[in-house]
């Protein structure tokens, strides 16, 4: 390995276990007769270069070879040497979370909120439209609640949309009245069903100067939604962030602004319209996910953008993200828990190939979630596109979407991957102090479509039962280097 890249690029190792008379798993480079594979780690910035080049994968990308080396293009190594260290790093103590909800919906949605909320470690509020029922006890596992003091009925249009739009102002005014308010840098706003990944939110915010005026979020996944509403708004279910200076300015002008935009449909458009009057435009972070999708979002999670996973929304309306769990809350809890082992690497995609007599495999790892094995060659450009396992949010149409997709045709089973979902994860620290993670994935045995393929390459691959992936814990500061590419 080139010395200049050695501190940045690590190796993924994947151990493939077989269903056979001799059940003991082995590595392919120990015995050629076994169907094993060494998968190399493609760091996010390496993957960016891999996808942006029109040349072939093996010439310009980072790849595995028979000597277990990682080869890195010279132009990438030069970029990786950049020093992006920023002093006075942001941490959770600098963030206030504002959760928009209602007395009617909170009990239904709070299981998702409580997957990520940490009492005593985080600062924020759930904003309700009225006091919760008198005979109920507010759970200690939830953020503390406040009742909005804003009389939204005095403003035309939807009063609930106006109230939700004002969550950032309510949060700002509440925290400014408390000791230590000078330490607050950012306000993170979401819905009651939004699942956030706090460590990744912190890592993302450390790319930005908190003293500047920022409005950070992401757009919808469905074109029909963005055309109907806007390409320049941060969708609130995905969550969005404003810097303290933006929140302060909104506190001075929000009420009058909401009156000016009372004709707009929802809270997201109203927030964006008011922020635009400050001369601040949306900074897009693709790790925020509104999830304006229906059915099964497997494809989106298995080919995540090259960005930290920041949020997921609309989960209650979707199929469980893993077939290993009966309910969506259980499935999402599994993802949240594995993310705590290596937040920055969660859902990051690694791609590798194994070509030798009798084996022609393409492998895609979505760390902490799934492994796909294709018993054929599939280009990295195609593997980077999510499988279209979902439909649009409003009309359940097969697109268009605001990102590239690969169609899924059940009648062409031999083109589909074998999919292994996360079973368990653990971390261990070596003698040198380096932390690595071990994640194990097992195949979805109920996938009858895959079993219908009669090609010999698929029949051999169907012997695989589990995949174990080893990876060094990713440094969250590496995300700063992605922006320099």
Predicted ranges, named:
Residues 2-74:
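N-terminal signal-anchor transmembrane helix specifying type II single-pass membrane topology
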Residues 107, 184, 191-205:
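Acidic donor-binding/catalytic loop of UDP-sugar-dependent glycosyltransferases
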Residues 126-185, 199:
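Active-site-proximal specificity loops/subdomain of glycosyltransferases
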Residues 197-198, 235-254:
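Conserved nucleotide-sugar donor-binding
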């Amino acid at each position: 390995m080139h010395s200049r890249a050695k501190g940045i690029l690590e190796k993924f190792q994947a151990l493939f276990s077989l269903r056979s008379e001799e059940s003991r798993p082995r590595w392919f480079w120990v015995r050629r007769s076994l169907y094993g594979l060494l998968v190399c780690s493609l760091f996010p910035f390496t993957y960016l270069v891999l996808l942006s080049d029109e040349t072939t994968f093996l010439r310009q990308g980072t790849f595995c070879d028979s000597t277990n080396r990682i080869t890195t293009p010279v132009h990438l190594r030069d970029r990786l040497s950049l020093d992006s260290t920023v002093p006075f790093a942001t941490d959770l103590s600098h963030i206030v979370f504002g959760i928009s909800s209602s007395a009617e919906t909170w009990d239904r949605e709070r299981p998702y909120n409580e997957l990520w909320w940490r009492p005593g470690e985080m600062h924020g509020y759930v904003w309700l439209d009225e006091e919760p029922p008198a005979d109920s006890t507010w759970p200690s596992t939830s953020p503390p609640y406040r009742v909005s003091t804003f009389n939204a009925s005095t403003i035309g249009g939807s009063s609930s949309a106006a109230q939700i739009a004002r969550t950032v102002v309510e949060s700002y005014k509440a925290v400014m009245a408390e000791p230590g308010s000078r330490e607050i840098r950012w306000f993170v706003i979401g819905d009651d069903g939004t699942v956030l990944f706090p460590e990744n939110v912190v890592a993302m915010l450390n790319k930005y100067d908190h003293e500047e005026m920022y409005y950070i979020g992401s757009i919808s996944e469905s074109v029909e939604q963005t055309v109907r509403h806007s390409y320049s708004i941060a969708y609130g279910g995905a969550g969005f962030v404003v810097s303290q200076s933006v929140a302060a300015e909104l506190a001075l002008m929000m009420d009058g602004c909401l009156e000016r935009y009372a004709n707009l449909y929802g809270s997201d458009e109203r927030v964006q319209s008011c922020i635009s009057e400050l001369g601040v435009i949306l900074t897009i972070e693709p790790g925020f996910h509104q999830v304006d999708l229906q059915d099964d979002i497997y494809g989106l999670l298995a080919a995540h953008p090259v960005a930290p996973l920041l949020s997921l929304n609309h989960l209650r309306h979707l199929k469980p993200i893993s077939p290993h769990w009966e309910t969506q809350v259980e499935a999402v809890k599994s993802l949240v828990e594995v993310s705590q082992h290596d937040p920055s690497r969660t859902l990051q995609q690694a791609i590798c190939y194994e070509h030798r007599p009798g084996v022609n495999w393409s492998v895609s790892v979505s760390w902490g979630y799934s492994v796909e094995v294709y018993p054929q060659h599939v280009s990295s450009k195609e593997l980077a596109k999510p499988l279209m396992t979902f439909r649009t949010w409003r009309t359940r149409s097969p697109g268009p979407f605001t990102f590239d997709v690969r169609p899924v045709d059940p009648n062409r089973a031999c083109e589909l991957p074998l999919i292994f979902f996360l079973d368990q994860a653990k971390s261990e620290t070596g003698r040198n102090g380096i932390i690595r993670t071990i994640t194990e994935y097992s195949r979805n045995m109920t996938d009858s479509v895959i079993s219908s393929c009669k090609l010999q390459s698929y029949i051999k691959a169907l012997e695989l039962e589990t995949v174990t992936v080893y990876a060094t814990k990713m440094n969250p500061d590496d995300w700063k280097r992605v922006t320099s590419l």
